[in-house]
Amino acid sequence: MFFKNSVNCTRKKQDLLRMEQITPYKPLHKVRIVTAASLFDGHDAAINIMRRIIQSTGVEVIHLGHDRSVEEVVNCAIQEDANAIAMTSYQGGHNEYFKYMYDLLQEKGATHIKIFGGGGGVILPEEIKELMDYGITRIYAPDDGRELGLQGMINDLVKTADFA
């Protein structure tokens, strides 16, 4: 048992070292991102960590907190002239939530606003594909975290949202 734990510990240290070597992407343009946790979702720890890392890259973040409706988020993104929306959804209902967000942005003529999301393992791979095929910019999965690390995911989000 000790050997197994020490191997896992070594692997975790290697992963941390790899993640530390990722240089934060610095945007070329002014980038504004609205962050929130979805309606009926009180799990805001992940989005709070992510927003702080996003802010550290020089991006302006408008954070709405948890338990936010699609209309609240979309209206804020439009009013604040945001480049993107970054959401977490750990409570289920994410397919309807993200699709409604996309549809509402289209309806309001805000097609330039990109939508990013994540929900740990709650959003299944086939649902991620369905949402991205629908028009959601990116849904991050646990494998993305393992492959890219947190800073790598933030870099991807900020770089994709970095447009004039």
Where are these regions (language model features)?
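Aromatic (phenylalanine/tyrosine) cluster motif
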Residues: 2-3
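Cationic, low-complexity basic patches in intrinsically disordered or flexible, solvent-exposed regions
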Residues: 14
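Non-catalytic signal-transmission and effector/linker regions of two-component phosphorelay proteins
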Residues: 17-31, 163
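Short hydrophobic segments within beta-strands
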Residues: 34-36
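Cofactor-cradling patches in redox/metallo enzymes
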Residues: 40, 47-57, 61-152
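A charged, well-structured terminal subsegment
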Residues: 147-164
